[in-house]
């Protein structure tokens, strides 16, 4: 394997992808803690698993190798000291409940096999799982209704966000919300210690220790020379600027970064919830991210005279900026919901714009977004629909649920 990670476009034939099958973490959601854990509803586990399995099999049927985050993470932690280090970091970053000794929780987690350990960390540790010593301190006697020593990680099935493949390397991301911060730790250990990746010296363009947040749902690889990144509710302009500087100084293929400003709200969480590439010259878009005349704030970042200086050009037309960086005379923006104010809002809420391209002009979408799917077909796109009644409750679509590891060049 020459490069274990290789992604130079959004639409090149997908060869290898990383998924996470929803597990116990979804069942550990309760109404009282939905907002804290970034959910609006509680998926029904048996059905969301069936839908996710259908999604994975749909990809396999098209020749895609499907990897699972939970399996790779377990395979990476073969060394005893490595397991202990990983658990220590998970507990520290998860701010595991201070009323239980760190060591007690650590010993409990390390008593499991690797596979069970990963599932337990992802699923969360309930307070009634661990026998603690007799309560002798006042703080221990205080009634505490919070049910977890270690919070569940229900957003993990959105593998797109904690890390993103960019060329032959990747970003391992600092997530904005505390509920998701630990997620990128899995990818850090997989890249460093899993035999599939560890011997290849995979470049890390930006790591999770950088102080400003960036998330993979905002990172779109337009072509070998250009990436687009959303300035969003979850991704900071400062992180984009740092990533651009790192890319320009450490490699010579990517020459432009488009910073696309989108409204900062939950409905438009990441750039890929409102804008995705479906063919060489076709994109889906949610019309509400544009002003009355189609105006937006787009900044084209290019290498400056030195490593710490960027050339920044402002544009107010997404169409014109895309045509410039892609070298196209014409392109098509396909509106989510057909531009109808009700259909577009409804289908965008259920990720109508969040398509996963598995080849040029071939996309995977949620079946429930029938207006958008019909419009895509009318524009010559092959649309492969997957079941979505429970998957969509997490507010993420097929692109959100997948991290491409290898794509063919276009």
Swiss-Prot record:
Record's protein name: Arginine deiminase
Pathway assignment: Amino-acid degradation; L-arginine degradation via ADI pathway; carbamoyl phosphate from L-arginine: step 1/2
Gene: arcA
Source species: Bacillus thuringiensis (strain Al Hakam)
GO molecular function, one term: arginine deiminase activity
Intracellular or extracellular location(s): Cytoplasm
Gene3D superfamilies associated with the record: Arginine deiminase (1.10.3930.10), L-arginine/glycine Amidinotransferase, Chain A (3.75.10.10)
Pfam families in the cross-refs: ADI
Catalytic activity: L-arginine + H2O = L-citrulline + NH4(+)
GO cellular component, one term: cytoplasm
């Amino acid at each position: 394997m020459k490069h274990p990670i290789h992604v130079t476009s959004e639409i090149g034939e997908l060869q290898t992808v990383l998924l996470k099958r929803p597990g116990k973490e979804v069942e550990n959601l309760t109404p009282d803690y939905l907002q804290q854990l970034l959910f609006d509803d509680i998926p029904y586990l048996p059905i969301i698993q069936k839908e996710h399995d259908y999604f994975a099999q749909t990809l396999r049927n098209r020749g895609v190798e499907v990897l699972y985050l939970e399996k790779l993470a377990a395979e990476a932690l073969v060394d005893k000291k490595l397991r202990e280090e990983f658990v220590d970091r998970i507990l520290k970053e998860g701010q595991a409940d201070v009323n239980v000794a760190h060591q007690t929780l650590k010993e409990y987690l390390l008593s499991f096999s690797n596979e069970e350990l990963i599932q337990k960390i992802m699923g969360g540790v309930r307070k009634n799982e661990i026998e603690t010593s007799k309560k002798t301190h006042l703080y221990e006697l205080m009634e505490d209704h919070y049910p977890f020593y270690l919070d569940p990680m229900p957003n993990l099935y959105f593998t797109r966000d904690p890390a993103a493949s960019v060329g032959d390397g990747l970003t391992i991301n600092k997530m904005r919300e505390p509920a998701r911060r630990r997620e990128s730790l899995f990818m850090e250990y997989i890249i460093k210690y899993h035999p599939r990746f560890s011997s290849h010296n995979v470049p890390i363009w930006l790591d999770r220790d950088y102080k400003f947040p960036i998330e993979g749902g905002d990172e779109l690889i337009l072509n070998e020379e250009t990436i687009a990144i959303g300035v969003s509710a979850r991704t900071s302009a400062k992180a984009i600027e740092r990533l651009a500087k790192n890319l320009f100084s450490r490699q010579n293929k990517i020459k432009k970064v488009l910073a696309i400003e989108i409204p900062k709200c939950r409905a438009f969480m990441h750039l890929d919830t409102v804008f995705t590439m479906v063919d060489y010259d076709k994109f889906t878009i949610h019309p509400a991210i544009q002003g009355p005349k189609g105006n937006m704030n787009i900044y084209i970042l290019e290498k400056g005279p030195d490593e710490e200086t960027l050339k920044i050009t402002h544009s107010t037309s997404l169409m014109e900026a895309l045509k410039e960086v892609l070298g196209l005379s014409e392109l098509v923006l396909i509106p989510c919901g057909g531009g109808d104010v009700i259909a577009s809002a409804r289908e965008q809420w259920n990720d109508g714009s969040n398509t996963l391209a598995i080849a040029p002009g071939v996309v995977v979408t949620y079946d429930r977004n029938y207006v958008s799917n019909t419009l895509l077909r009318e524009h010559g796109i092959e649309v492969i629909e997957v079941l979505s009644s429970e998957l969509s409750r997490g507010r993420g679509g097929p692109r959100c649920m997948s991290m491409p590891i290898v794509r063919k060049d276009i």
